[in-house]
A protein has these predicted regions:
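Flexible "arm" and connector segments at domain edges
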Residues: 1-151
Length: 151
C-alpha cells in the first residue's frame, strides 16, 4: 500500500486539531499512543472477535470499516509525530493467526513503539495493522476509498 499520499492527507486533516500547549513531547507521545490503543480497541470491539461466549449479534461491515479507518488515521498521525513519513509503501500480507491473536500482536507492536521507538517497530505496526484489514476482507482499494471519504 502506498503511504505517501495518506501521510500528506493526514497532515492536512491534523491541521485542524488544537493540541494542548501544556504537553511536553513525552506526554504528547504517550497520549497519541494511548489514543491508538483506544482506536484499536474500538475496532476489535466492532469485530466482536474477542467474544468467547455465544453471541447472536451480527457485525456491521460498514461500522468495522469506519473503525478501521479511524485507527489508520491514528497510526498515520503517530508516524508523522515520530518522523517516519519517508516510508513509501507497505506490502499487505496475509496472516494465518486468528483475528483476536492479530489484535493482541498489534497491542504488542504499540507497546514496542512506546518503549523503544524505532522506524522498524513502526513498520511492523503498519504491516500488522494492514494484515488485520486483509483478514477483515478489506482490499487496498476499499481502505483508500474509505479513507478518502472520511471527513
Amino acid at each position: 500500500m502506498k503511504l505517501n499520499n495518506l501521510f500528506k492527507m493526514q497532515a492536512e486533516r491534523n491541521k485542524d486539531l488544537k493540541v494542548l500547549t501544556n504537553l511536553d513531547e513525552y506526554k504528547l507521545n504517550a497520549r497519541k499512543l494511548l489514543a491508538l490503543n483506544v482506536r484499536v480497541g474500538n475496532l476489535a470491539n466492532a469485530t466482536k472477535c474477542f467474544k468467547y461466549w455465544e453471541d447472536s449479534e451480527t457485525t456491521d461491515p460498514d461500522y468495522i470499516l469506519q473503525k478501521y479507518i479511524n485507527a489508520l488515521s491514528c497510526i498515520l498521525t503517530v508516524g508523522m509525530f515520530k518522523g517516519y513519513t519517508d516510508i513509501d509503501s507497505i506490502e499487505i500480507k496475509s496472516n494465518d493467526y486468528c483475528l483476536s491473536d492479530q489484535f493482541l500482536n498489534l497491542y504488542v507492536d504499540i507497546n514496542d513503539l512506546l518503549t523503544t521507538s524505532s522506524k522498524d517497530h513502526y513498520i511492523t505496526l503498519l504491516e500488522d495493522f494492514l494484515s488485520i484489514g486483509k483478514s477483515l476482507g478489506l482490499t487496498e482499494e476499499i481502505i483508500i476509498d474509505a479513507y478518502l471519504k472520511q471527513s
